[in-house]
Amino acid sequence: MFAVIKTGGKQYRVAANDLIKVEKVAGEAGDIVEFAEVLMVGSTIGAPTVAGSLVTAEVVEQGRGRKVIAFKKRRRQNSKRTRGHRQELTTIRISEILTDGAKPSKKAAEKKAPKADAAEGEAAKPKKAAPKKAATKAESAE
């Protein structure tokens, strides 16, 4: 079964275990993301979205696309400008396509839970203050 999802202003046709690059999605490698804006599932077309459907995916990596060069030149003015741009991209692996309000499988939920516990543990630890510097000879002579 396939679905059409909308993310980052673009539409993607996805199926289970597909590996796709989309516009930047918040999350680190291994995090589970959910796409609720499902435009089509199999032969069911949404108006504008299919109610109760959900696509879950795992973030594989965060990266950047290839460089796009923007070159501007004004003729006969001895004026030109070159500028490069690299778009932030996220590679995701589609885990499952859910319909009729079904919940994500336990595997997806288990991967999500440990990340939340680790984040709370790190936030609880206070940072240590930097050690004070010893007085130099010039300062102690004064």
UniProtKB/Swiss-Prot annotation:
InterPro entries reported for this sequence: bL21-like, bL21-like_sf, Ribosomal_bL21
UniProt keyword annotation of Oxidoreductase present: no
UniProt key word RNA-binding: yes
Matches recorded under Pfam families: Ribosomal_L21p
Record keywords, A-Z: Ribonucleoprotein, Ribosomal protein, RNA-binding, rRNA-binding
Single GO BP term: translation
Biased composition (Basic residues): 74-84, 126-135
Ranges for region Disordered: 74-142
GO molecular function annotations of the record: rRNA binding; structural constituent of ribosome
Biased composition regions of type Basic and acidic residues, renumbered to the chain: 107-125
GO CC annotations, alphabetized: cytoplasm; ribonucleoprotein complex; ribosome
Domain of life: Bacteria
Known role: This protein binds to 23S rRNA in the presence of protein L20.
NCBIfam families assigned: L21 (TIGR00061)
Subunit structure: Part of the 50S ribosomal subunit. Contacts protein L20.
Family: Belongs to the bacterial ribosomal protein bL21 family.
Protein name as it appears in the record: Large ribosomal subunit protein bL21
Lineage of the organism: Bacteria, Pseudomonadati, Pseudomonadota, Alphaproteobacteria, Hyphomicrobiales
